[in-house]
Design a protein with these regions (language model features):
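Acidic catalytic/metal-coordinating carboxylates
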Residues: 36-39, 62-70
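Alpha4 helix (beta4-alpha4-beta5 surface) of REC/receiver domains from two-component response regulators
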Residues: 65, 79, 90-110, 119, ...
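Non-catalytic signal-transmission and effector/linker regions of two-component phosphorelay proteins
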Residues: 1-6, 119-135
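Short hydrophobic/Thr-rich beta-strand motif most characteristic of the beta2 strand and flanking loop
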Residues: 28-35, 43, 112
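Active-site beta3 strand of CheY-like receiver
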Residues: 47-53
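Charged docking surfaces used in two-component/phosphorelay signaling
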Residues: 18-26
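Active-site residues of response regulator receiver
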Residues: 55, 87
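Receiver (REC) domain active-site loop signature in two-component systems and cognate sites
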Residues: 58
């Protein structure tokens, strides 16, 4: 799989989507984009990505709802989809805060803080891609 892995980036901010696309494509990844959770669920079926990079706070359907939807039997095929959450909250606080606020355990692989540092993002994406390549 390696660098040819396909990554679905979901963020309502077009500038953030473009920045993430540039960072990921410069490292050799294939990038598909969606602007909200509803579009994300459609793209999952169409594109069959290897990894989902998901903003939590979006209009129409947010990241919380996407994580919850992936537990639904209709999306059982994607239940083990690796997810990196984009968060503007400090990483050490994010997981506890979001679990408390939503009452739903977010089963995600990692968190990346906004503003995004490309080296941090690429390191975390690389770790997940290597892990899933071994599965």
């Amino acid at each position: 799989m390696g660098k040819s892995a396909k990554i679905l980036v979901v963020d309502d901010d077009p500038d953030m989507r473009e920045a993430l696309q540039m960072i990921l494509e410069s490292a050799g990844y294939t990038v598909v984009m969606a602007e909200d959770g509803k579009q994300c669920l459609s793209k999952l079926k169409e594109e069959q990505p290897d990894l989902l990079i998901l903003d939590l706070l979006m209009p129409r359907m947010d990241g919380f709802e996407v994580c919850k939807a992936l537990k639904d039997p209709r999306y059982a095929k994607y239940a083990r989809m690796p997810i990196i959450i984009l968060s503007s909250v400090q990483e050490g606080v994010s997981h506890r805060r979001y679990e408390l606020e939503t009452g739903v355990r977010l089963d995600v692989d990692d968190y990346v803080e906004k503003p995004i540092e490309s080296s941090v993002l690429l390191e975390r994406v690389g770790k997940i891609i290597k892990r899933i390549a071994k599965e």
